[in-house]
Structure formats: C-alpha cells, structure tokens
Amino acid sequence: MKEIVRALEGYGPPKDKAAEQCGWQAGGALCPGGLCCSQYGWCANTPEYCGSGCQSQCDGGVGGEGGCVDLGCANTPEYCGSGCQSQCDGGVGGEGGCVDLGSIISRSTFEEMLKHRNNAACPAKGFYTYDAFISAAKAFPAFGTTGDVDTCKREIAAFFGQTSHATTGGWPTAPDGPYAWGYCHKEELNQASSYCSPSPAYPCAPGKKYYGRGPIQLSWNYGQCGQALGLDLLNNPDLVATDRVISFKAAIWFWMTPQFPKPSCHDVITGQWSPTGHDISAGRAPGYGVITNIINGGLECGRGWDARVEDRIGFYKRYCDMFGVGYGSNLDCYNQTPFGLG
C-alpha cells in the first residue's frame, strides 16, 4: 500500500518573499491565479516571467482559454462565475466539454466505485465522502474538466484507479472482486519511517513523520503540498488523515503538480504531455502506465511484470468500464525506465 510520491527551485524575488514560489525550486508548485512561473521559481504575468524559460502557466492567466470579466481574463471560478461576460466555461467546457465535475461523477457513481470503503474492517470507515471530494476539487478547476467528456471521465477513472490501489483493502476473492475495495485505508500501515528529508525551505518538525496519508498516500513532500494549499503540513501532517477535504486536496494537488523531471499526472491523462526524445528512448509513451511511473516508478517500473502495476490497471479498467470510456494505450510501465534514472 505504501506509495513513494516524492516531489522534487524568474527573475529576482519580490522583496517580501524569502523562498521561491513555484516550479522545481518549490517542489513543482503552481503559481496562484494562473500566474507564470519563471525559470527561477517566481510568480508574475510579465514577459520576463512568461517568456523564455517559463516553467508553467506561461500565458500568465490572461491567455485565450479563460473567461473574460471586466478587468481581465482567467479560468478560475472568480472569473468564470457571476459577472463573466464571455467564454464562461473557462476554456474547459463548451461543446463536448465538461464544466461541472458533478456531471462527470455523480454521488451514486462515487458510492458504487468505492462501495466497500465503509466496511467495518476498513480503517478509513466513514472518512472518505463524495461531498469532501467535490469540495476539494473546486480548488483545482482543471481537474476532471479538461478536454472532451470522454477525457474528463478517463481522468477521474485514472485518479481513482491510482488512489484506490494506494488505499486498497481488497484481496483476490473479496466480495464484488478486489477492485471494489478502494479507499479502505487513510494511513500507511508501516509508520516506522519518518520520511524526513530536511531542507532550509522545508525543515522537518520535531517528532513529526511524513509517511503516507490520504488517497494518494502522500509521503515526504508535506512542505511543498502545505505551501501550495496554504497549510502548515510540516507541523500538522495528520491533517491529511483527519480532515477529509484536506486529504482529497493533498491527493489532487499531487495529481495536478509537475514533479521535475516528471510531468503531472493530469497532463498525461488529458493528452497535454508530449514525450521528449529522451522519454521515447526510455520507453515512456503517453498512457496510464506513465502515471504509475510518476507515482512509484522507482519501485514498480522497468522490472517486467509486477502485481502492483496490475492492481493499478485493474482498478482503472473497472472505473473506465463504469464510465463507458476506453482505456487508451500503454497501460503498464513494465518496459519504462523510471523518471530520473534514464
């Protein structure tokens, strides 16, 4: 069940900031409000930040895919909601697109996908709820709403496929099959390691451990995640296992955030990631298998057949079938070199 999901620093820093804000310098964090992340890890929407070397969101939140209000353009709820003048789906909906995550995954579908999560034998009984998931997802407007309807559904299937494996309580002969037992756990079973790798920007708090918690079993990178969510997770890592909305937010943050040199899981499943020649040489082709490589490639990929990889695929296929969408290609990572190793 343990997942090792470790995230790995534009121009001069604002005078009131002491640490980089985004990009690889900040653990892959994105700038708030769609601002550009410069090559040096700072946020703004000027040409110096959004031009050469820009790491992410390089239209600065003012490009052609956002909704338009009287003071500018972006694709956040503040711009695309009340008072929006045009293109109010923010570039993620429209004809064949998906604006409302609730229209992609309904409460009844959520319950059927995770039908045994509240079994008396599950340590996470009563913790994971549909309302918490939907509430958390609102902090990430592009999650599950990017592309056409099939792409949106496939992203949700992939997200729950990976997180269900991370939290599974299933076994081969389990009632309704092993892939109906996702979200049975909320904390890593082996909590002996502290998963502490201190740095000046993210010092480990005395007595705190950063083992796997929540749907994605977030490990190590509580500092980066907390910074992105506006929370002190270094001193309060248990929030990821005690606050159900924060738990889902942490998982979706990991899903949406590139981890240098890895792309984000979101960009892979929505077709926005294009492999480099180096990726192609390493066997990393677009598909669900690359997401497994992003999450736990160092332990599961490039080693031939692996039961853990098969388990991830099994959950994903079940959910795709429920949504009525195809699986895509390249589902495993058996012949992929892990990111960072080649």
Swiss-Prot record:
This is Inactive chitinase-like protein 2. Keywords: Allergen, Chitin-binding, Disulfide bond, Plant defense, Signal. GO terms for biological process: carbohydrate metabolic process; cell wall macromolecule catabolic process; chitin catabolic process; defense response to fungus. Pfam families: Chitin_bind_1, Glyco_hydro_19. GO terms for molecular function: chitin binding. Belongs to the glycosyl hydrolase 19 family. Chitinase class I subfamily. Inactive chitinase-like protein that does not exhibit hydrolytic activity toward chitin. Binds strongly to chitin and possesses antifungal activity toward the fungal pathogen Altenaria alternata in plate assays. Probably involved in defense against fungal pathogens through a mechanism that only involves carbohydrate binding. Residues 20-60 form the Chitin-binding type-1 domain. Disulfide bonds join 22-37, 31-43, 36-80, 84-88, 122-184, 196-204, 301-333. Residues 1-19 form the signal peptide. PANTHER family: CHITINASE 12, CHITINASE-RELATED. The lineage of its organism: Eukaryota, Viridiplantae, Streptophyta, Embryophyta, Tracheophyta.
